[in-house]
């Protein structure tokens, strides 16, 4: 009886660890192709939970990538970045802003393909997110892109479809950062 109980306990322990280590994967389906992202729930639990609230409520469906920041379309900025930004939602459907999970806490830096939350001031991120094109250390804590030096909340990484993100970034260089037509985000869903 003791051996059976011990065996069941060990089996349960192994199962719990496997479930706890399950990767959270989402697929961003766009009109130009899919972008697959892995979310780092253990490192950035607040930001991932926030993103998944929008995903699970289907609020990102039929939104868009609306902004592309390239080295050539930010002439007034002394610190240049390269990102694409999307996921802007009707203000009546936006959830409460979340606390900023700084890169010093999470250890997730703004490298090529990093998924991060857009914000104005600290603790103001809601739904809009961006994907880094190339490494962007100026978006990390103490980075110079934002005057407050607090950085942005990185919470995942593109694992497939980075070519789609780069196509979006280069679509309309003549239009500046905000472009038309926007690239439709058909849906964002969890990978089953």
Regions found by a protein language model. Name each.
Residues 18-192:
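Cyclophilin-like peptidyl-prolyl cis-trans isomerases
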Residues 1-23:
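Bacterial Sec-dependent N-terminal signal peptides
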């Amino acid at each position: 009886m003791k051996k059976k109980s011990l065996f069941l306990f060990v089996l349960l322990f192994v199962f719990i660890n496997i479930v706890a280590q399950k990767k959270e994967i989402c697929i961003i389906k766009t009109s130009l192709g899919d972008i697959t992202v892995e979310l780092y729930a253990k490192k950035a639990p607040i930001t991932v939970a926030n993103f998944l609230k929008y995903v699970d409520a289907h609020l990102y469906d039929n939104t868009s990538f609306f902004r592309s920041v390239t080295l050539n379309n930010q002439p007034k900025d002394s610190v240049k970045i390269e990102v694409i930004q999307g996921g802007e939602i009707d203000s009546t459907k936006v959830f409460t802003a979340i606390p900023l999970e700084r890169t010093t806490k999470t250890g997730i830096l703004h490298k090529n393909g990093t998924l991060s939350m857009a914000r104005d001031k600290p603790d103001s991120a809601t739904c809009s997110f961006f994907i880094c094109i190339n490494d962007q250390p100026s978006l990390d804590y103490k980075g110079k892109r934002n005057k407050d030096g607090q950085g942005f909340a990185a919470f995942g990484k593109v694992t497939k479809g980075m070519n789609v993100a780069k196509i979006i970034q280069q679509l309309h260089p003549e239009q500046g950062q905000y472009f038309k037509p926007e690239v439709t985000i058909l849906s964002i869903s969890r990978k089953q």
